[in-house]
Regions:
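Residues that define the transmembrane beta-barrel architecture of outer-membrane proteins
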Residues: 1, 56-60, 66, 105-109, ...
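Outer membrane beta-barrel strand-and-loop segments of large Gram-negative receptors
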Residues: 72-128, 137-157
Length: 273
């Protein structure tokens, strides 16, 4: 049994209270339980663990929404045997090992603030700020000793949509994301963020759409993390193609304004009944 429950109370149109909870189970994939050691490069390997256990996640939250636009929500989540790919340095063999493992326990609690409001006919804003404390426990395979990590983290996400022209056929989106240092698996990631910009123009009675934009304008989405505990002292930098110019062209084929072809007819005989 994996029960989910929710309770909502709205005394009037402007106030809404909600409490909900759920429990989920995730099972390891085949490549995570593969016991063979695969060399990714001369000095790094990928390893599975056939003894992996299913992961169980619990989540409970309660919040208040005012006027369907402003929300504050407290949450608590706990994961047992979380599935993760942990990075360890084998100092004896000079290898960097990516090992599929179970995190013993991961607990986080905090508060979310959300604003979702149309300030005018031409401007809509979504804003999310989350503040939480997280602890993670796992076993170091090289020493067989428990490792405890703790971190207070926060992040913000902001989406701004603008509409231009009388028919609102021209629009622009500016999206921002920023995260402070956070725990992920057996590493602590430094702060990172990104700013995206997109413009869209619709033509031909909204059947044709042309979009252009830039993702991660300031190229700040690279993620640097450290692993400093017991016999581990390592760093990693995830450097991808973050800053991108994107363009798209879409056209809706067919009749996008289908009408009901149901015919109505007047029967004179009915008027006499």
């Amino acid at each position: 049994m994996f029960p989910s429950a929710s309770l909502e109370y709205s005394p009037n149109k402007k106030h809404d209270f909600k409490v909900y909870s759920f429990r989920k189970v995730s099972r390891p994939r085949y490549n995570s339980v593969n016991p063979f050691q695969i060399f990714q490069s001369t000095f790094s390997t990928i390893e599975g663990d056939p003894k992996l256990l299913p992961a169980t996640r619990y989540y409970i939250a309660g919040g208040y929404t005012y006027n369907k636009m402003y929300t504050a929500e407290l949450f608590y989540k706990k994961a047992k045997n979380g599935l993760a790919s942990l990075i360890f340095q084998n100092n004896d063999n000079n290898l960097l090992q990516f090992i599929s493992s179970n995190l013993d326990e991961n607990v986080a609690y905090g508060i979310d603030f959300t604003i979702n409001k149309s300030f005018s006919k031409f401007y809509n804003c979504y804003f999310l700020a989350s503040f939480y404390n997280e602890t993670s426990n796992f076993k170091n395979p090289t020493t067989n000793i428990e490792v405890d990590q703790q971190q207070f983290s926060w992040f913000i996400r902001n989406s701004n949509s603008f509409s231009f022209l009388s028919d609102q056929s021209l629009s622009a989106d500016i999206n921002l994301f920023y995260s402070s240092a956070l725990i992920a698996e057996n590493a602590i990631f430094d702060a990172f963020g990104a700013v995206n910009f997109m413009m869209r123009k619709t033509l031909c009675n909204k059947q044709l759409s042309v979009s252009m934009g830039i993702e991660d304008i300031f190229n700040q989405g690279n993620q640097f993390n450290t692993r400093n505990y017991q016999d581990q002292s390592g760093t990693s930098l995830t450097k991808g193609e973050n800053r991108l110019f994107v363009a798209s062209l879409r056209y809706k084929f067919g009749n996008s304004k289908m009408r009901d072809n149901k015919k109505s007819k007047r029967v004179d005989e009915r008027n006499r009944i």
